[in-house]
Amino acid sequence: MSGPIDRLIAQMRQAPRAVRFADAIKVAERYFGAARQKGSSHVVFKMPWLGDPRVNLQNDRGKAKACQVRQLLDAIDKLNREERDG
């Protein structure tokens, strides 16, 4: 891991409760593209899998909610596994 997004992901794994909302958005946009919905305290990203799954990120006084950070990390891990395994 060496790039800025990789460093953010490492920080997210270390302390999911301390993730800035803007950083979570930055990571999600890198992996899943533009948000499907934004403009409120919630930002929704569509996942590339069947069934229309989503990752929802919610601004909680400048921080992303820890449970949503973990969901984002799980989605990134799944995407990386699928790319690796074909």
Residue ranges and their predicted role:
Residues 2-37, 47-86:
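Basic nucleic-acid-binding interfaces
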Residues 42-46:
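Minor-groove-contacting beta-hairpin "wing" of winged helix-turn-helix DNA-binding domains
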